[in-house]
UniProtKB/Swiss-Prot annotation:
Ranges of the Extracellular topological domain: 20-233
Biological source species: Xenopus laevis (African clawed frog)
Tissue spec. comment: Expressed in thymocytes.
Keywords recorded for this protein, A-Z: Disulfide bond, Immunoglobulin domain, Membrane, Repeat, Signal, Transmembrane, Transmembrane helix
SMART domains: IG, IGc2, IGv
Name of the protein in its database record: V-set and immunoglobulin domain-containing protein 1
Lineage of source species: Eukaryota, Metazoa, Chordata, Craniata, Vertebrata
Length: 318
Protein backbone atom coordinates (compact mmCIF):
# COMPACT_ATOMS: atom_id res chain seq x y z
CA UNK A 1 0.00 0.00 0.00
CA UNK A 2 2.79 2.38 0.90
CA UNK A 3 4.60 1.46 -2.30
CA UNK A 4 1.58 2.43 -4.42
CA UNK A 5 1.25 5.71 -2.50
CA UNK A 6 4.92 6.46 -3.14
CA UNK A 7 4.50 5.87 -6.88
CA UNK A 8 1.39 8.10 -6.98
CA UNK A 9 3.14 10.97 -5.20
CA UNK A 10 6.13 10.59 -7.49
CA UNK A 11 3.99 10.87 -10.62
CA UNK A 12 2.19 13.91 -9.20
CA UNK A 13 5.45 15.71 -8.45
CA UNK A 14 6.74 14.89 -11.92
CA UNK A 15 3.61 16.36 -13.48
CA UNK A 16 3.90 19.50 -11.35
CA UNK A 17 7.53 19.94 -12.31
CA UNK A 18 6.51 20.09 -15.98
CA UNK A 19 3.61 22.51 -15.47
CA UNK A 20 3.74 26.31 -15.59
CA UNK A 21 2.91 27.70 -12.14
CA UNK A 22 0.45 30.60 -12.29
CA UNK A 23 -0.36 32.82 -9.29
CA UNK A 24 -3.34 35.21 -9.00
CA UNK A 25 -2.93 37.99 -6.45
CA UNK A 26 -6.59 39.10 -6.15
CA UNK A 27 -9.14 36.45 -7.22
CA UNK A 28 -12.07 38.84 -6.58
CA UNK A 29 -12.09 42.40 -7.93
CA UNK A 30 -14.78 45.10 -7.76
CA UNK A 31 -14.34 48.21 -9.87
CA UNK A 32 -16.61 51.19 -10.52
CA UNK A 33 -17.90 51.80 -14.03
CA UNK A 34 -15.57 54.07 -16.03
CA UNK A 35 -12.48 53.27 -13.96
CA UNK A 36 -9.48 51.06 -14.79
CA UNK A 37 -9.01 47.51 -13.49
CA UNK A 38 -5.64 45.79 -12.99
CA UNK A 39 -5.67 42.00 -13.14
CA UNK A 40 -2.50 40.65 -11.48
CA UNK A 41 -1.12 37.36 -12.81
CA UNK A 42 2.45 36.01 -12.37
CA UNK A 43 4.00 32.73 -13.52
CA UNK A 44 7.07 30.52 -13.02
CA UNK A 45 8.57 28.50 -15.89
CA UNK A 46 10.49 25.28 -15.41
CA UNK A 47 11.94 25.60 -18.88
CA UNK A 48 13.71 28.93 -19.25
CA UNK A 49 13.50 28.76 -23.03
CA UNK A 50 10.77 31.30 -23.81
CA UNK A 51 10.62 30.80 -27.55
CA UNK A 52 7.33 28.94 -27.19
CA UNK A 53 5.81 31.21 -24.52
CA UNK A 54 2.10 31.95 -24.98
CA UNK A 55 0.00 34.19 -22.70
CA UNK A 56 -3.74 34.48 -23.13
CA UNK A 57 -6.51 36.24 -21.18
CA UNK A 58 -10.14 35.21 -21.74
CA UNK A 59 -13.43 36.35 -20.23
CA UNK A 60 -16.68 34.49 -19.69
CA UNK A 61 -19.15 37.37 -19.72
CA UNK A 62 -21.85 37.30 -17.05
CA UNK A 63 -24.43 39.22 -19.12
CA UNK A 64 -24.13 37.53 -22.52
CA UNK A 65 -22.83 34.15 -21.27
CA UNK A 66 -20.25 34.26 -24.09
CA UNK A 67 -16.51 33.66 -23.99
CA UNK A 68 -14.22 36.22 -25.61
CA UNK A 69 -10.49 36.79 -25.93
CA UNK A 70 -9.22 39.81 -24.00
CA UNK A 71 -5.48 39.65 -24.71
CA UNK A 72 -3.11 37.29 -26.57
CA UNK A 73 0.71 37.19 -26.71
CA UNK A 74 3.07 34.92 -28.69
CA UNK A 75 6.57 35.30 -30.17
CA UNK A 76 6.81 38.94 -29.16
CA UNK A 77 3.51 39.85 -30.83
CA UNK A 78 0.35 40.83 -28.92
CA UNK A 79 -3.24 41.70 -29.79
CA UNK A 80 -6.49 42.53 -28.03
CA UNK A 81 -10.00 41.16 -28.56
CA UNK A 82 -12.62 43.21 -30.47
CA UNK A 83 -14.31 44.51 -27.31
CA UNK A 84 -10.98 45.43 -25.71
CA UNK A 85 -9.17 47.07 -28.60
CA UNK A 86 -7.03 50.01 -27.37
CA UNK A 87 -8.14 49.28 -23.80
CA UNK A 88 -5.56 46.69 -22.65
CA UNK A 89 -2.05 47.41 -21.37
CA UNK A 90 0.19 44.41 -20.60
CA UNK A 91 3.17 44.35 -18.19
CA UNK A 92 5.08 41.78 -20.27
CA UNK A 93 8.06 41.62 -17.93
CA UNK A 94 9.64 38.19 -17.22
CA UNK A 95 7.29 36.11 -15.11
CA UNK A 96 4.54 38.75 -15.22
CA UNK A 97 1.32 38.39 -17.24
CA UNK A 98 -0.55 41.24 -15.52
CA UNK A 99 -2.88 43.38 -17.65
CA UNK A 100 -4.78 46.63 -17.04
CA UNK A 101 -8.15 47.28 -18.71
CA UNK A 102 -9.35 50.88 -19.03
CA UNK A 103 -12.86 52.33 -18.97
CA UNK A 104 -14.63 49.33 -17.45
CA UNK A 105 -18.31 48.92 -18.35
CA UNK A 106 -21.13 46.71 -17.10
CA UNK A 107 -20.62 44.19 -19.93
CA UNK A 108 -17.04 43.65 -18.67
CA UNK A 109 -18.37 41.82 -15.61
CA UNK A 110 -17.40 38.14 -15.67
CA UNK A 111 -14.77 35.50 -14.95
CA UNK A 112 -11.30 36.26 -16.35
CA UNK A 113 -8.79 33.47 -16.99
CA UNK A 114 -5.01 34.00 -17.15
CA UNK A 115 -3.42 31.10 -19.04
CA UNK A 116 0.33 30.65 -19.62
CA UNK A 117 1.80 27.98 -21.92
CA UNK A 118 5.48 27.26 -22.61
CA UNK A 119 5.93 24.08 -24.64
CA UNK A 120 6.80 21.36 -23.90
CA UNK A 121 5.47 22.27 -20.44
CA UNK A 122 1.77 21.92 -19.63
CA UNK A 123 -0.16 25.16 -19.36
CA UNK A 124 -1.07 26.74 -16.06
CA UNK A 125 -3.96 29.09 -15.37
CA UNK A 126 -5.68 31.21 -12.74
CA UNK A 127 -9.13 32.81 -12.52
CA UNK A 128 -10.43 36.20 -11.38
CA UNK A 129 -14.05 37.13 -10.68
CA UNK A 130 -14.44 40.77 -11.70
CA UNK A 131 -17.58 42.82 -11.06
CA UNK A 132 -18.16 46.27 -12.53
CA UNK A 133 -20.21 48.40 -10.13
CA UNK A 134 -22.82 50.53 -11.91
CA UNK A 135 -25.37 53.00 -10.49
CA UNK A 136 -29.01 52.32 -11.41
CA UNK A 137 -30.18 53.52 -14.79
CA UNK A 138 -33.37 55.57 -15.04
CA UNK A 139 -36.13 53.05 -14.25
CA UNK A 140 -39.23 52.36 -16.33
CA UNK A 141 -42.57 52.96 -14.56
CA UNK A 142 -45.71 51.19 -15.76
CA UNK A 143 -49.23 50.26 -14.67
CA UNK A 144 -50.72 46.78 -14.81
CA UNK A 145 -54.50 46.58 -14.79
CA UNK A 146 -57.41 48.84 -15.73
CA UNK A 147 -57.15 52.31 -14.17
CA UNK A 148 -60.76 52.44 -13.04
CA UNK A 149 -62.37 52.77 -9.64
CA UNK A 150 -62.79 49.41 -7.95
CA UNK A 151 -60.28 47.60 -10.20
CA UNK A 152 -57.26 45.65 -8.93
CA UNK A 153 -54.02 47.24 -10.25
CA UNK A 154 -50.29 47.18 -9.55
CA UNK A 155 -47.43 49.60 -10.31
CA UNK A 156 -44.18 48.25 -11.77
CA UNK A 157 -40.65 49.70 -11.75
CA UNK A 158 -37.45 48.30 -13.31
CA UNK A 159 -33.90 49.55 -14.08
CA UNK A 160 -32.02 47.87 -16.91
CA UNK A 161 -28.62 48.76 -15.39
CA UNK A 162 -27.41 48.60 -11.84
CA UNK A 163 -24.77 46.63 -9.88
CA UNK A 164 -25.21 45.76 -7.09
CA UNK A 165 -28.78 45.00 -8.08
CA UNK A 166 -30.97 48.00 -7.18
CA UNK A 167 -33.71 47.95 -4.59
CA UNK A 168 -36.94 49.82 -5.30
CA UNK A 169 -39.27 51.96 -3.25
CA UNK A 170 -42.62 53.58 -4.12
CA UNK A 171 -43.97 56.83 -2.69
CA UNK A 172 -47.00 58.94 -3.35
CA UNK A 173 -46.28 62.58 -4.30
CA UNK A 174 -48.47 65.20 -2.61
CA UNK A 175 -47.64 68.89 -3.00
CA UNK A 176 -44.01 68.02 -3.72
CA UNK A 177 -43.71 65.81 -0.63
CA UNK A 178 -43.23 62.03 -0.62
CA UNK A 179 -45.83 60.05 1.33
CA UNK A 180 -45.43 56.42 2.30
CA UNK A 181 -47.67 53.87 0.59
CA UNK A 182 -49.58 51.45 2.83
CA UNK A 183 -50.12 49.00 -0.02
CA UNK A 184 -48.05 45.86 -0.62
CA UNK A 185 -44.58 46.62 -2.05
CA UNK A 186 -41.79 44.29 -3.24
CA UNK A 187 -38.46 46.11 -3.00
CA UNK A 188 -36.57 43.48 -5.01
CA UNK A 189 -39.02 43.27 -7.91
CA UNK A 190 -40.10 46.93 -7.81
CA UNK A 191 -43.83 46.20 -7.69
CA UNK A 192 -46.49 48.04 -5.71
CA UNK A 193 -49.82 46.24 -5.40
CA UNK A 194 -52.93 48.38 -4.99
CA UNK A 195 -56.10 46.44 -4.20
CA UNK A 196 -59.33 48.03 -5.37
CA UNK A 197 -58.54 51.49 -6.71
CA UNK A 198 -60.33 54.30 -4.88
CA UNK A 199 -60.38 58.07 -5.28
CA UNK A 200 -58.12 58.34 -2.23
CA UNK A 201 -55.37 56.34 -3.98
CA UNK A 202 -55.36 58.44 -7.14
CA UNK A 203 -52.50 60.86 -7.81
CA UNK A 204 -48.79 60.90 -8.70
CA UNK A 205 -46.49 58.05 -7.67
CA UNK A 206 -42.68 57.99 -7.72
CA UNK A 207 -40.40 54.94 -7.90
CA UNK A 208 -36.79 55.21 -6.68
CA UNK A 209 -34.16 52.64 -7.72
CA UNK A 210 -31.03 52.78 -5.58
CA UNK A 211 -27.78 50.99 -4.72
CA UNK A 212 -24.58 52.09 -2.98
CA UNK A 213 -23.46 54.01 -6.09
CA UNK A 214 -26.52 56.20 -6.57
CA UNK A 215 -30.22 56.29 -7.37
CA UNK A 216 -32.63 57.17 -10.17
CA UNK A 217 -36.38 57.83 -10.27
CA UNK A 218 -39.45 57.75 -12.49
CA UNK A 219 -43.04 58.96 -11.94
CA UNK A 220 -46.50 58.16 -13.24
CA UNK A 221 -49.95 59.69 -12.92
CA UNK A 222 -52.52 57.29 -11.51
CA UNK A 223 -56.09 58.50 -11.94
CA UNK A 224 -59.28 57.04 -13.33
CA UNK A 225 -59.66 57.88 -16.99
CA UNK A 226 -55.90 58.31 -17.27
CA UNK A 227 -54.10 55.53 -19.04
CA UNK A 228 -57.30 53.53 -19.14
CA UNK A 229 -59.07 56.41 -20.93
CA UNK A 230 -56.22 56.74 -23.40
CA UNK A 231 -56.36 53.04 -24.16
CA UNK A 232 -60.16 53.16 -24.57
CA UNK A 233 -59.89 56.17 -26.91
CA UNK A 234 -57.26 54.36 -28.95
CA UNK A 235 -59.50 51.29 -29.23
CA UNK A 236 -62.54 53.37 -30.26
CA UNK A 237 -60.48 55.29 -32.80
CA UNK A 238 -59.22 52.03 -34.27
CA UNK A 239 -62.76 50.66 -34.56
CA UNK A 240 -64.00 53.83 -36.28
CA UNK A 241 -61.14 53.72 -38.76
CA UNK A 242 -61.90 50.07 -39.51
CA UNK A 243 -65.60 50.89 -40.02
CA UNK A 244 -64.75 53.67 -42.48
CA UNK A 245 -62.47 51.38 -44.46
CA UNK A 246 -65.15 48.66 -44.59
CA UNK A 247 -67.76 51.21 -45.78
CA UNK A 248 -65.48 52.43 -48.58
CA UNK A 249 -64.75 48.88 -49.73
CA UNK A 250 -68.47 48.00 -49.66
CA UNK A 251 -69.35 51.10 -51.71
CA UNK A 252 -66.74 50.24 -54.37
CA UNK A 253 -67.96 46.63 -54.58
CA UNK A 254 -71.59 47.74 -55.02
CA UNK A 255 -70.66 50.23 -57.74
CA UNK A 256 -68.74 47.55 -59.61
CA UNK A 257 -71.68 45.13 -59.41
CA UNK A 258 -74.06 47.83 -60.74
CA UNK A 259 -71.82 48.40 -63.74
CA UNK A 260 -71.77 44.68 -64.49
CA UNK A 261 -75.60 44.48 -64.30
CA UNK A 262 -76.29 47.20 -66.97
CA UNK A 263 -78.21 45.72 -70.07
CA UNK A 264 -75.89 44.92 -72.96
CA UNK A 265 -76.05 47.04 -76.13
CA UNK A 266 -78.07 45.44 -78.95
CA UNK A 267 -77.38 45.71 -82.66
CA UNK A 268 -80.15 46.17 -85.22
CA UNK A 269 -79.58 45.42 -88.82
CA UNK A 270 -80.61 48.14 -91.29
CA UNK A 271 -80.61 48.36 -95.03
CA UNK A 272 -77.33 48.00 -96.81
CA UNK A 273 -76.06 45.40 -94.30
CA UNK A 274 -75.15 48.17 -91.87
CA UNK A 275 -75.66 47.88 -88.14
CA UNK A 276 -76.69 50.54 -85.74
CA UNK A 277 -76.65 50.41 -81.93
CA UNK A 278 -79.94 50.88 -80.13
CA UNK A 279 -80.88 50.65 -76.49
CA UNK A 280 -82.33 47.46 -75.08
CA UNK A 281 -85.37 49.43 -73.91
CA UNK A 282 -88.61 49.84 -75.93
CA UNK A 283 -87.66 51.37 -79.26
CA UNK A 284 -89.33 54.32 -80.84
CA UNK A 285 -89.72 54.25 -84.61
CA UNK A 286 -87.20 56.44 -86.38
CA UNK A 287 -88.49 59.89 -87.10
CA UNK A 288 -87.40 59.76 -90.71
CA UNK A 289 -89.73 56.82 -91.33
CA UNK A 290 -92.78 58.78 -90.19
CA UNK A 291 -93.02 60.68 -93.49
CA UNK A 292 -92.89 57.49 -95.54
CA UNK A 293 -95.93 55.94 -93.87
CA UNK A 294 -99.32 56.15 -95.54
CA UNK A 295 -101.37 59.25 -94.65
CA UNK A 296 -104.31 58.69 -92.44
CA UNK A 297 -107.81 59.26 -93.86
CA UNK A 298 -109.07 62.81 -93.29
CA UNK A 299 -112.76 63.55 -92.96
CA UNK A 300 -113.87 67.11 -93.61
CA UNK A 301 -117.11 68.64 -92.21
CA UNK A 302 -118.79 71.78 -93.48
CA UNK A 303 -120.42 74.33 -91.26
CA UNK A 304 -123.80 72.92 -90.28
CA UNK A 305 -125.18 76.33 -89.34
CA UNK A 306 -124.53 77.73 -92.81
CA UNK A 307 -126.01 74.70 -94.53
CA UNK A 308 -129.03 74.73 -92.33
CA UNK A 309 -129.70 78.34 -93.27
CA UNK A 310 -129.71 77.43 -96.90
CA UNK A 311 -131.90 74.42 -96.18
CA UNK A 312 -129.24 72.09 -97.42
CA UNK A 313 -127.69 69.08 -95.89
CA UNK A 314 -124.39 67.66 -96.89
CA UNK A 315 -122.89 64.27 -96.45
CA UNK A 316 -119.43 64.10 -95.21
CA UNK A 317 -116.87 63.63 -97.96
CA UNK A 318 -113.79 61.64 -97.76
Amino acid sequence: MSFLLFITLGLSLTALSHCVQVTIQNPIINVTSGQNATLYCTYILNNQNKNNLVIQWNIFQAKSQNQETVFFYQNGQSLSGPSYKNRVTAAMSPGNATITISNMQSQDTGIYTCEVLNLPESSGQGKILLTVLVPPSVPHCSIRGAVETGHFISLLCYSEEGMPRPIYSWNRVENGLLKSTPSQMNQQKGSLIIGNLTDFEEGYYRCTASNNLGNATCELNLHTGGEGGVIAAAVIGGLLAAAIIIAIVWFLVVKRKQKKQLPPTKEMKTGGNQYMAVSGEANEPPKENLGASEPTETIQFHDHAENAANGETEEPTA
